[in-house]
């Protein structure tokens, strides 16, 4: 059990039967009554943030989060298959758990699987990954006044905006958090 006096940013706790991570907290002592702890909590499975106030000294169950290195192997129908880097055990992940990350999953990409009490709750991609341009529109030469990007398709099928000089077959670096072009590889 963990008390409100032990709160730290990043601490994982169970609140009303749901797993949360403390994103922010502040001890508040009003003029009347006992001290309270104001907290912003990030839901570990859904990702949303809520604000709650707890009485000082209230206790919560601490949760254990573990990370394991996995390698993306292949997509089979609607599921994505990963292999544990240590045990070579394979797991199947549904696309709902991955969200927009599916746009950046290519074969043999190393990722981190996030487990909450032995239940897979998410996958973390590397922040910057190298991808190949599969298709690219032709840019209009001399068009530097208006929008200086064009749409290109990555090897995974995802669309991305790239500078005009990028052409089919080029290797680029992509930020997986924003889905934006970073630089040539």
From Swiss-Prot:
List the GO cellular component terms: cytoplasm
Biological pathway? Protein biosynthesis; polypeptide chain elongation
**PROSITE patterns, alphabetically?**
EFP
Its primary localisation, in coarse terms, equals cytoplasm
Asked if the record carries the keyword Cytoplasm, the reply is yes
**What keywords are annotated for this sequence in UniProt?**
Cytoplasm, Elongation factor, Protein biosynthesis
**One GO term (biological process):** peptide biosynthetic process
Pfam families in alphabetical order: EFP, EFP_N, Elong-fact-P_C
The GO terms describing molecular function are: translation elongation factor activity
Known PANTHER family for this protein?
Answer: ELONGATION FACTOR P, ELONGATION FACTOR P (EF-P) FAMILY PROTEIN
Similarity comment: family membership: Belongs to the elongation factor P family.
Q: What does this protein do?
A: Involved in peptide bond synthesis. Stimulates efficient translation and peptide-bond synthesis on native or reconstituted 70S ribosomes in vitro. Probably functions indirectly by altering the affinity of the ribosome for aminoacyl-tRNA, thus increasing their reactivity as acceptors for peptidyl transferase.
Q: What is this protein called?
A: Elongation factor P
Which organism encodes this protein? Endomicrobium trichonymphae
